Amino acid sequence: FKPFVYSAAIEKGYTPGTIVNDAPVKFGRYSPKNSGGSYAGPITIREALYRSRNVVAVKVLHAIGVDYARSYVQRFGFPAKNIPKDLTMVLGSGQATPLQMARGYSVFANGGYLIEPYIIDRIYNDKGQLIARTQPLVAGISAPRTIDPKNAFIMYKMLQDVIQYGTGRAALALGRSDIAGKTGTTNNQKDAWFVG
């Protein structure tokens, strides 16, 4: 969920070059940790994203406000009921299906437009006659623009850095220059995935 919160921060005036101190912090009884327990000190949010620094993400969310961020991330198609009302939201503690995540990330790739994914394009009857066809929302034509195109571009570039320099380097094996996305893991590395 880090990219969605960073997008909200960009909307509030942050830039990829905004520096946040990656250092231990406590918010009441909550003390976020980075994977591996290390800290990088002052770091740009761009680098914090591609290195997947949890503490920086939580600090950014705290600075922009949980309520604002919850409202903002709904622009990516996530239902409010599945978005936590606390700082753990940025670390992916809510509920989202893989399809919802793909739809959310597509906003960055589509210039800020929220499309509706579909699986079935056409249905034919037993006589070969077309009986139904999907009419999807098309980015730039019928889909709603839910974030500023500059924001979408900045986030797309930041997500490309995840592939070039960060935790998603394995995707370089595909030999494509347009890949952008984010890795994700659960506590204790039980589950891992990539979306983008």
Feature locations, PLM:
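Substrate-binding cleft of carbohydrate-active enzyme catalytic domains
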Residues: A8-A9, V56
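Conserved catalytic neighborhood of penicillin-recognizing serine enzymes
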Residues: Y14-A69, D86, L114, D126-I154, ...
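A penicillin-recognizing enzyme superfamily signal
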Residues: F1, Y50, T97-G196
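Mid-domain, small-residue-enriched loop/turn segments at the edges of structured enzyme/sensor domains
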Residues: S31-G36, G65-R103, G112, I119
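Soluble periplasmic/extracytoplasmic beta-strand elements of cell-envelope proteins
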Residues: I19-N21, V90-G92, R122
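Active/ligand-binding-proximal structured segments within catalytic/core domains
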Residues: F1-A8
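Secondary-structure transition/capping motifs at alpha-helix termini
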Residues: I10-T18, P79-K81, N110-I115
